[in-house]
A protein has these predicted regions:
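Core nucleotide-handling region used for phosphoryl-transfer chemistry
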Residues: 1-147
Length: 147
């Protein structure tokens, strides 16, 4: 509930997200992201203020995930940050799990090990196997170790 006690609601109100959605006639979308900052999951990014990084925008009329490019466009329009996009390729170039695990390694600007990477098609592809759009997370094994 918007009781101004939730850090997420405070962020949404401060950044006028609801108003921006209405101003841009985007009341038919759902925006999903990662909320980060002080007091949240050890604040691995070492942020001084809460921040929200968008990773999915869904059209609620069709219940379909929007493409990477449409998501970027909406985030720019609304003044929202997206999760960092490290790589965009037309073809999936990784040949095996070891290559993916190596690609998932890395550190945040804070010096902490990053959690890993998420791999998705540029245009959402529905999978009957998982009953939803394809998406795969590859964890950084170094992240799983105690720091």
């Amino acid at each position: 509930a918007d009781d101004d006690k939730s850090a997420m609601w405070k962020y949404a109100n401060k950044h006028k997200i609801e108003e921006r959605l209405k101003e841009n006639n985007l009341d038919n979308i759902a925006i999903q992201g990662e909320f980060c900052g002080p007091g949240i999951q050890k604040n691995r990014l070492k942020l001084t203020e809460p921040e929200w990084y968008v990773f999915t925008v869904t059209d609620m009329n069709t219940n379909k995930r929007l493409s990477l490019y449409k998501t970027e466009e909406i985030c720019k329009l609304l003044g929202l940050n997206m999760v960092p996009i490290e790589e965009v390729e037309e073809e999936f170039k990784y040949k095996n799990v070891d290559e993916l695990l190596e690609r998932a390694k890395g550190k945040y600007a804070s010096g902490k090990n990053k959690e890993g990477i998420v791999i998705r098609p540029i245009e959402a592809v529905y999978s009957n196997t998982i009953a939803g759009p394809l998406s795969m997370k590859v964890l950084n094994n170094d992240y799983l170790l105690k720091e």
